[in-house]
Amino acid sequence: MKEFLIGLLVVFLSFILVLIFNALKAKLTARKLTKRNEHKTKEEQIEYAKRLSEMIKCETVSKEGSYDDTEFKKLRNVMENLFPNIHKSAEKMTFSDDCWIYKIKGKDESRNIILMSHHDVVAVTGEWLHPGFCGEIFDDSLWGRGTVDTKTPLFAEFQALEDLLSEGFVPECNVYIGSSHNEEIGGDGIPEALKYFKENNITFETVLDEGGAIISPPLAGIKANCAMMAIHEKGRYTLNCYAKDTSGHKGLTANKNTPVARMSAFITEVNTKNLFIKRLYPEVKGMFTHLCPYAPFIMTLLFSNLWCFGSLLKTLMPKLNAQAGAMVGTTCTFNDINTNKEEKYCHAKAFLRPVYESDLKEDLKQIEKIAKKYNIELVPAENNECFKTTDVNSKSVEYTKKCINEIFPDVIPAPYILPAGTDARHLCSISESVIRFAPIEMNDKQFASVHSENEHISLDSIANSVVFYKHYLKNYR
């Protein structure tokens, strides 16, 4: 018995030592964070902001089912005036109503990269401290719809290339800039451009779009901001759900099994049951691996030993918040619920966001079981899609991290899964490396202003974005 207890103690101590060893090993991988140099003077920051403000003043709101070119034409004129070198040197193509594709030829014309940021915005609603399209500077920030999402990255891409061209720069490979006019409504801009790329056998070594940024740390206890790079985007899958009634006139029966009642029960059960597969996907593990060396020791211990604590984490993450839950499995939202006057049928749409297509197939089986229970017919909508992920260790991801470290030495780069949507998803079929990261730095208020009131961005963030893209293009090999 004594030998057994001693053996048990040895096993337990060995287990603890392994946990501590892995945590210490992770701590040793932490890069020393250093103070950032001011890349631009205050006067230069203000000058960039004034130029960007001309773009912000263009009210390029995209709307479902209609297109008015007035404000979009105004923006095109602004771009031509602001960036004459690009418009003189680049080949420009337009797809759909106003999706721009610019191409600057490189030394090696067989290779291509593309920088992206859409130029449409959502409508200004709610109460703002300053007019929604004022494009004016207050408290060292530029205010207006699009300053964060995403005219600042678009401006920075153009300004960086404009500056480089004025210096006689010739890129190592072809450099494209893509900007759609209807990203916010899931429009046809980039999909139309994709047809052209495929017809001409154009592929991209790297796609760099919006979707990530420099934000407050997502893990408690980390004292530096984090450059979150989305290397995967959740898929989109819509199910039309139908409940029908064959019982005759509802007023002549006491039937409680109505289409509305059955649909309500179906939706309730799908929403309340833990139906879907939960996993710690490689992209999420990569996020923890990159962030945990900078966290307090107990957090490092947890995240550096996912072999031990992974099951616990994938159970806890959905309980932390919706965004954390979205990274470990499929989410399902019901909308467009309607019935006819006689309540002879009820229709609802189930909008699913899977991480991987393989998991979606299993998740759909769970929904189908519940649908059968309530006699609900399920019909998949058209244009359902899942997207290819980017290898966290790919050359493009490593290069992007390198540029972040060099321009923002006080920031921690990390990959993650994007639960929202970008234009970049359309190019997954013609690129092995699709990265969703814009080098804008936001505090919590600025992050919360996306698609909300009081959207604004700091002047130094605008300038640093230009510096980042210039560095990225100049050193791309």
Task: Show which residues each predicted segment covers.
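Acidic/His- and Gly-rich active-site-bordering loop/insert found
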Residues: 12-147, 167-171
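Midchain, well-structured core segments that form catalytic/ion-binding scaffolds
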Residues: 191, 199-361
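An extended, acidic, His-containing surface patch that forms the Zn2+-binding/catalytic region
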Residues: 92-93, 108, 215-216, 276-344, ...
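Feature marks short, highly hydrophobic, charge-poor N-terminal signal-anchor/signal peptide-like helices
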Residues: 1-10
